């Protein structure tokens, strides 16, 4: 449990101190090994997902769980359970390039 709490703190801190902090909102950061992240971007959700995938990042859009998904565009379920803590800064930097 402490292992994942430390990992969570590391990833949240990486996002909060990065230059994309003003382009994201993080929700439910106290719920296990995942949180929700809204990306404030003019880019379409599909484009962000494809750009991230091309950089080795798999994003899970919240919209896939809703019938009327327009309200939930660019909100992603961020699961960090298998994430290598040493690569968090690199992942944030790659994600920055996608949005």
PLM region descriptions:
Residues 4-12, 24-38:
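Conserved glycine-rich beta-strand-loop-beta hairpin in the small C-terminal domain of fold type I
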Residues 23-24, 63-67:
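Short, solvent-exposed loop/turn elements at beta->coil junctions and helix N-caps
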Residues 37-41, 80-82:
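Short beta-strand-to-loop capping motifs
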Residues 42-49, 85-90:
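Short, conserved charged micro-motifs
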Residues 54, 69-99:
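PLP-dependent enzyme catalytic core of the Aspartate aminotransferase-like
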